[in-house]
């Protein structure tokens, strides 16, 4: 696999499907690197890594720390950093934090949530040499305000709003869009309406690529599994089995053996 760039992602529109998963540290970044196109250092780490109820508590310092770690482990995959809640509520703050993310984390692009109301912010970042991935549909940073995680596009008005958002972000300079929690037929319409790749999560198959949280898809989270997640491994049970066997060997004097001693 050749090194993935913002330019090569844009060229995948209507061509090869784009693959993206989250990554939060160097260890897993090395395992994922080159297997997928994009490693997203998502603010989802607040939940899957930090045990929070939603993504809102995490800040810029933590995002940069984890992204630096991912960049140390990734050589081929494109690394994208999420702009956390409160880091881009004004255009000036967005530019300051995006520049900081670029300079300190090593990421190749930033991702931020919001539709047409964030168009001017995205345009400002793009004008200053920052590659931006948009995020519309279900926006996790808005769940408290919206009262939970709700599928979008069920009503005609919502569908038209999503189309307007996608077009506005395309015109503002995003190189790709994440479309989350959107009815499949509406997601297909959105993907067809713009020239940039649309990467879905819980938005059906008729888009330009897919993204999942790694701990969901590899079975490390044993709680609620969303409908859109496919488990490719039962990671939690494998890890627990290994730890259990280690503890048993120690207690019964089988570890370390003579071969494992100096």
UniProtKB/Swiss-Prot annotation:
InterPro entries: Pantoate_hydroxy_MeTrfase, Pyrv/PenolPyrv_kinase-like_dom, Pyrv_kinase-like_dom_sf. Transmembrane segments: none annotated. GO terms for molecular function: 3-methyl-2-oxobutanoate hydroxymethyltransferase activity; magnesium ion binding. It catalyses: 3-methyl-2-oxobutanoate + (6R)-5,10-methylene-5,6,7,8-tetrahydrofolate + H2O = 2-dehydropantoate + (6S)-5,6,7,8-tetrahydrofolate. Binds 1 Mg(2+) ion per subunit. GO terms for cellular component: cytoplasm. Gene3D superfamilies: Phosphoenolpyruvate-binding domains. GO terms for biological process: pantothenate biosynthetic process. The active site is at 180 (proton acceptor). It is an enzyme of class 2 (transferase). Pathway: Cofactor biosynthesis; (R)-pantothenate biosynthesis; (R)-pantoate from 3-methyl-2-oxobutanoate: step 1/2. Keywords: Cytoplasm, Magnesium, Metal-binding, Pantothenate biosynthesis, Transferase. 3-methyl-2-oxobutanoate binds at residues 43-44, 82, 111. Mg(2+) binds at residues 43, 82, 113. Catalyzes the reversible reaction in which hydroxymethyl group from 5,10-methylenetetrahydrofolate is transferred onto alpha-ketoisovalerate to form ketopantoate. Homodecamer; pentamer of dimers. Belongs to the PanB family. HAMAP family: PanB (MF_00156). This is 3-methyl-2-oxobutanoate hydroxymethyltransferase. It comes from Wolinella succinogenes (strain ATCC 29543 / DSM 1740 / CCUG 13145 / JCM 31913 / LMG 7466 / NCTC 11488 / FDC 602W) (Vibrio succinogenes). The lineage of its organism: Bacteria, Pseudomonadati, Campylobacterota, Epsilonproteobacteria, Campylobacterales.
């Amino acid at each position: 696999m050749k090194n993935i760039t913002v330019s090569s992602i844009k060229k995948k529109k209507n061509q090869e499907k784009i693959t993206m998963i989250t990554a939060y540290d160097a260890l897993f970044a090395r395992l994922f690197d080159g297997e997928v196109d994009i490693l997203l250092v998502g603010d989802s780490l607040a939940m899957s890594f930090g045990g929070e109820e939603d993504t809102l508590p995490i800040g810029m310092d933590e995002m940069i720390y984890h992204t630096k770690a991912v960049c140390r482990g990734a050589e081929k995959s494109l690394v994208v950093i999420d702009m956390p809640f409160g880091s881009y509520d004004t255009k000036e703050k967005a530019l300051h934090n995006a520049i900081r993310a670029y300079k300190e984390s090593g990421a190749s692009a930033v991702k931020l949530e919001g539709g047409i109301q964030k168009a001017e912010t995205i345009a400002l970042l793009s004008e200053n040499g920052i590659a931006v991935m948009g995020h519309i549909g279900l926006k996790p940073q808005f769940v408290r305000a919206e009262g939970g995680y709700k599928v979008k596009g069920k009503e005609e008005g919502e569908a038209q709003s999503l189309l307007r958002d996608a077009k506005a972000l395309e015109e503002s300079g995003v190189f790709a869009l994440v479309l989350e929690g959107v009815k499949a037929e509406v997601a297909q319409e959105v993907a067809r309406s713009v020239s940039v790749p649309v990467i879905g999560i819980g938005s059906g198959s008729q888009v330009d690529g897919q993204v999942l949280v790694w701990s969901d898809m590899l079975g490390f989270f044993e709680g609620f599994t969303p409908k859109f997640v496919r488990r490719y491994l039962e990671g939690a049970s494998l890890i627990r089995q290994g730890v259990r066997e280690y503890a048993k060997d120690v207690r019964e004097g089988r570890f370390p053996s003579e071969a494992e001693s100096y």
